[in-house]
Every structure is written in C-alpha cells, then in structure tokens.
From Swiss-Prot:
Signal peptide range: none
InterPro entries the record matches: Ribosomal_bL19, Ribosomal_bL19_CS, Ribosomal_bL19_sf, Translation_prot_SH3-like_sf
The protein's name in its UniProt record: Large ribosomal subunit protein bL19
Gene source species: Treponema denticola (strain ATCC 35405 / DSM 14222 / CIP 103919 / JCM 8153 / KCTC 15104)
BP GO terms, sorted: translation
Upper taxonomic lineage: Bacteria, Pseudomonadati, Spirochaetota, Spirochaetia, Spirochaetales
Amino acid sequence: MSDLIMKIEAQQKAENPPVFRVGDTVKVHFKIVEGKTERIQVYEGLVICFKNSGIGRTFTVRKNSYGVGVERVFPLHSPRIAKVEVVRPGKVRRAKLYYIRDKVGKAAKIKTLITKKNS
C-alpha cells in the first residue's frame, strides 16, 4: 500500500520546488483562473511557517495590507505556483513565527541574513 502511495506522490511532486526558509520575505507568483482567462497574481510577504511533509507540504505567507494582517496558505507542490522569489532572506531562530501576529510596527521586523561571498 505504501509503495502505491509513494508512486502517486512522486508523480504529483513539483520538478524543482522553490528553496526558501521561514523568515524570508518572498514574492509568490500564483496563477488564478477566472473563467477562460488565466493570470498571475503576486503575493509578497513573510514566510511564517511550513507545515506537513511530502506532497501535502504547505507554507504560510503573512503581509500587512492597509494596516490589517493578512495570511495566505500555499501548497508547496501546487502546479498553480508559477515561481517563488526570495526578496530578502531573514535571520530567525524559530521554526514557526506565530508571535509576529501580535507584534506591531518595528517589533514585527525580521533581521536580514547576511551571507559571506567566497572570493
């Protein structure tokens, strides 16, 4: 039974899933179908968590829209995700950033991860 499930999941998985981490500010390019037309909507925000594993893995992106916090959950292996761009890598020490929901203003900011370039 598990071999059958693994075969089906292998077919459904994305070829190259995007590489990003919790704390990163990302732009998610998401395909939206309205009638016969298809367009791409960009959703930019902070990745606050990853959930589950395998084909059902999801990530939650939070942004402030007109002073109101908005969160959206995206399936990682969805064919509707065109691409995920990392705008700014973040430096965090937690796997789930749910505490950001209660923070306001400057307290809700995440430090930027600085990486060394190999010369």
